[in-house]
């Protein structure tokens, strides 16, 4: 059953829809592309909710009418009424779930692009190789979704692994799908260099940040310490004779970003600022979330980066997501970018937790 809080929100839905329809033909809105997209998106969501609520009210009315037929002296009519009532109650439950999901608070970052950061963890070179495999997994997932991947910074190892990679993933809904990937990923396998056949455990950490636009985060010049240096290669040797590498420190938070992939200092500085904005947005968003969720956590492991979220076990061809007790024996498919099944289950779990929180209000 829908609670009073949700019913109150639904009562004004048609009025809200009329206002949004009027806004779609407002000249002020039409000349502002960003505002128009925002209104069109809200109109689409509200229209869907309005249709669901209309059907819900009709089903409630049909239930009451069908109940009156249960006392009919005609046995055949009674049996038909019982069957109809069963179907109507089932549809009522389905509609309640759909309406509740539509009314869940939307994450304002869901439609944003993503800054993806992957770093090798415990396990030396094996961890660096695993970090590289994770990056390829996300690249392939992005390809499947039609998203673009742009490497902002990469520190490879001599043996083909990755110490750290930072990339921008551009595409509709990128953050809504990838935000659950933040945390510690663990691999269990026999390294190629291991002669005794012993299984090693290594880790890599993944951070997924919504891309921050300049309007999202205000950075004052006096808050920045900008240093330039010569870029160095995988083995530490200097690869550039000019001071093209850039390191930016945000003094109030102590956040440090380095970038050396481009040949020009100007390009490295622009990329470093892009990463810094995303990290600062994430930092301030986290502070806000911690304040709001002091008493109750509603997210499925999208917060703590030290949380061990997933294990990739090569000998068993197994991937386990520890947050939702999900296990798949399609390890190579998943590493090839087939992530939708896991992500869909993580989204469903988050919705379930949010619905539970709403029902307790």
Curated annotation (Swiss-Prot):
UniProt main location, coarse: cytoplasm
Q: Which UniProt keywords apply?
A: Cytoplasm, Methylation, Protein biosynthesis
The cysteines covalently paired via disulfide bonds are none
Modified positions (N5-methylglutamine) are 237
- Superkingdom of origin organism: Bacteria
**Does the keyword Signal belong to this entry?**
no
Q: Name one GO molecular function term.
A: translation release factor activity, codon specific
Pfam families attached to this UniProt entry: PCRF, RF-1
Q: Where in the cell is it found?
A: Cytoplasm
SUPFAM superfamilies xref list: Release factor
Indicate yes or no for the key word Protein biosynthesis: yes
Q: Which GO terms describe its cellular component?
A: cytoplasm
PTM description? Methylated by PrmC. Methylation increases the termination efficiency of RF1.
Matching InterPro entries: PCRF, Pep_chain_release_fac_I, Pep_chain_release_fac_I_sf, Prokaryotic/Mito_RF, RF-1
The family classification in the record reads: Belongs to the prokaryotic/mitochondrial release factor family.
Q: What does this protein do?
A: Peptide chain release factor 1 directs the termination of translation in response to the peptide chain termination codons UAG and UAA.
* Protein name stated in the entry: Peptide chain release factor 1
The species this protein was found in = Persephonella marina (strain DSM 14350 / EX-H1)
